[in-house]
Amino acid sequence: MQTSPLLEALTEALRCLPGVGPKSAQRMVFHLLQRDRSGGMRLAQALTRAMSEIGHCADCRTFTEQPVCTICANPRRQQSGQICVVESPADIHAIEQTGQFAGSYFVLMGHLSPLDGIGPDDIGLGRLQERLENESIEEVILATNPTVEGEATANYIAEMCAHYGVMASRIAHGVPVGGELEMVDGTTLSHSLAGRHPIKF
């Protein structure tokens, strides 16, 4: 039982974070109060600003405090003719770290899931359709997760692209670098075999 309502409220608030249970939240609270009150104040200020000032990019729907994010505001990225469709802003960061993509993005903020009542309008496909209609898009790279929902979402968007005469491609899925075949699941191995490519000398 907590000795302070504020302690209890803060502990409960921290539990909204993924992977944080009662014990972890309590340890965080005690650490901030005992050892790092200034850090706690900075955290509170940063959270308050972020929650009130960060919105969505008007073009790609990623998180930004500006009307348009820095990637969408870059003329070179817009002129590439490529849009990479991802499920979350975190996926953009992962792809950007590779340094292999120089186009623009579109963030779904999820995936199609009829059983959960999530349809095309809920993941912003209307906005993607507008971009296909109004921009000079040559290729849409579908980088949704390799799940049942992710594949269904990719197929739906691929059909949409076909309607506008835009090429749709799917990122490759397969055996991870350094992985061993005996440890790979059957579905991943099937994708690897289907996506094999010739070795050129």
From Swiss-Prot:
* Zinc fingers classed as C4-type: ranges: 57-72
What is an example of a GO molecular function annotated in this UniProt entry? Answer: DNA binding
A Pfam match is Toprim_4
Which keywords has UniProt assigned to this entry?
Answer: DNA damage, DNA recombination, DNA repair, Metal-binding, Zinc, Zinc-finger
Gene3D superfamilies, A to Z: 3.40.1360.10, 6.10.250.240, RecR Domain 1
Q: Does the keyword DNA damage apply?
A: yes
Q: Where is the Toprim domain?
A: 81-176
InterPro entries referenced in this protein's UniProt entry, alphabetically: DNA_Rcmb_RecR, Rcmb_RecR, Rcmb_RecR_Znf, TOPRIM_dom, TOPRIM_RecR
Report the protein's function.
May play a role in DNA repair. It seems to be involved in an RecBC-independent recombinational process of DNA repair. It may act with RecF and RecO.
Of which family is this protein a member? Answer: Belongs to the RecR family.
Protein name in the entry: Recombination protein RecR
Organism field: Sodalis glossinidius (strain morsitans)
Q: Which gene encodes it?
A: recR
